[in-house]
Amino acid sequence: MARVTVEDCVDKVPNRFELVLLAGHRARAMSAGAELTVDRDNDKNPVVALREIADRTIMPEDLREELIGSMQSRVETEEPEVEQMQLLMSGEAAGEVKDTFGAAEGGGERMSEEDLLRAIQSQIDSPQQKSADADDMDGED
């Protein structure tokens, strides 16, 4: 029965290897509780997945996007600007922030917006670095 189903699907997904990937992904989704779009007829999940693809009740393009999304392990984040990164990597930024805080608390010079943003960023980055170091220690056994 599965051979006939595979033959029915080849015109919807021309590459048999991709067809197997998509049907396998759909079968795992069914096992996890996804709703069926065709009658089960006492068939196993991979056969039902192939029948769904053959009947076009599930679109291969949608399955492909779901499969790609499930395989991605992390989301790309924006890279910090090179200039800011260089400031953070050098010891100058930390010294400037301390001087600026001291001046602001003493009632002397006012802190510029740029200095305030650097100070906030250094405060944000510091706890993240400590928690990342703690995570690295937990992972080592």
Curated annotation (Swiss-Prot):
Which keywords, in A-to-Z order, does the entry hold?
A: DNA-directed RNA polymerase, Nucleotidyltransferase, Transcription, Transferase
Q: Please provide, alphabetically and separated by semicolons, the GO molecular function terms listed in this UniProt record.
A: DNA binding; DNA-directed RNA polymerase activity
The EC category is transferase
Region annotation (Disordered) maps to 121-141
Gene3D superfamilies assigned: 3.90.940.10
GO cellular component: a single term: DNA-directed RNA polymerase complex
The record's section on InterPro entries has:
DNA-dir_RNA_pol_omega (IPR003716), Pol_omega/Rpo6/RPB6 (IPR006110), RPB6/omega-like_sf (IPR036161)
| Reactions accelerated catalytically | RNA(n) + a ribonucleoside 5'-triphosphate = RNA(n+1) + diphosphate
Keyword Iron-sulfur attached: no
| GO BP terms in the entry | DNA-templated transcription
Q: What EC number(s) are associated with this protein in UniProt?
A: 2.7.7.6
**What are the Polar residues biased-composition ranges?**
121-131
HAMAP family noted in UniProt: RNApol_bact_RpoZ
Protein purpose: Promotes RNA polymerase assembly. Latches the N- and C-terminal regions of the beta' subunit thereby facilitating its interaction with the beta and alpha subunits.
Q: What does the subunit comment say? A: The RNAP catalytic core consists of 2 alpha, 1 beta, 1 beta' and 1 omega subunit. When a sigma factor is associated with the core the holoenzyme is formed, which can initiate transcription.
The similarity annotation says: Belongs to the RNA polymerase subunit omega family.
Protein name per UniProt: DNA-directed RNA polymerase subunit omega
Say which species the protein is native to. Parvibaculum lavamentivorans (strain DS-1 / DSM 13023 / NCIMB 13966)
